[in-house]
Amino acid sequence: MGAQLLAYAAGGDIEMLLEELSRQPLAEIGWDNIFPHSLENNCKLRTLLDLPFPVLHWHGDRIILPNTAELIASSCRCKEQLFSIGPLAYGLQFHVEIDEEMVNTWIKEDQKFISSVLGADGQFILKQQQKEFGSKTLASRLEFISTLFDLLS
């Protein structure tokens, strides 16, 4: 929600995420990679994204970036995953802060959304993904957060 508010406050907008060809509603929920949007982007965060960078996605919207935003990273389903507006404002449409307890809480509280996106086995799928990626990606996610804080200081 913070990335959406940041973009909206700067003149952007938010709309439902749609599948490109069918224009049917699409949601991103679960672990998947983000990747650099442009090779020319010199943002320090970009270097962390050169390798596969799995993060947790949990949204059904996309951000229409304002003209002042610079797109840094995308995913296969949603172009607007990481962006900056000026040197001190960054928007993330994914979750690097997540731990197993948080995922389990979200799974418990968001069952309807999970089922609508992933089907009846959605809760099981998310728990399995968390076991697969949670601890394995912790170091890279902490490095991402540390680099982001360095950029903001």
Where are the regions a protein language model picked out?
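Amide-donor transfer/coupling interface in amidating biosynthetic enzymes
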Residues: 36-153
